[in-house]
Amino acid sequence: MKTSRLPIAIQQAVMRGLREKLAQANLKLGRNYPEPKLSYTQRGTSAGTAWLESYEIRLNPVLLLENSEAFIEEVVPHELAHLLVWKHFGRVAPHGKEWKWMMESVLGVPARRTHQFELQSVRRNTFPYRCKCQEHQLTVRRHNRVVRGEAVYRCVHCGEQLVAK
């Protein structure tokens, strides 16, 4: 676990937030779910991921450093909810009704599927594409899929196919 760039105070705050939400969930659910493993190895634009089988939460250290408070209040409970849902209900839809219930009724956090953090510092090279209404930035992976003819992307607003600029 490489965490040398992440101040110990932030790591402690994350752990404190995780333990508080876990205790709250255990109390409300009448269970004694164990503390998940926590690592700071998530990369890219994902804020975090929950690994069910290894019962682990992986957090993005760059986004955590830039958005500490919101991260602890939103991302940590979001990923914890995935693990608790898996323990409580088994394998169900990732952001389904069980997850929403766990977030809102048990953990007391608004159930949002995605974060709104600024991604400039974690975004790699992008490629400009256009549609009728705006310019889009496609990741290297998506751009390569277009080039190889494996994928076509459309604008969510106007529905037009994206074309390389």
UniProtKB/Swiss-Prot annotation:
GO cellular component: cytoplasm
Annotated binding of Zn(2+), by residue: H78, H82
Swiss-Prot/TrEMBL keywords: Cytoplasm, Metal-binding, Zinc
Gene Ontology MF terms: zinc ion binding
Active site: E79
Protein name from the UniProt record: Protein SprT
Entry's transmembrane regions: none
Location within or outside the cell: Cytoplasm
Pfam families registered for this protein in UniProt: SprT-like, Zn_ribbon_SprT
Keyword Cytoplasm: yes
GO biological process: response to stress
Cofactor binding note of this UniProt entry: Binds 1 zinc ion.
Cofactor(s) this protein cannot do without: Zn(2+)
Key word Zinc present: yes
Family from the record: Belongs to the SprT family.
Domain SprT-like: 20-163
Main localisation: cytoplasm
Highest taxon in the source lineage: Bacteria
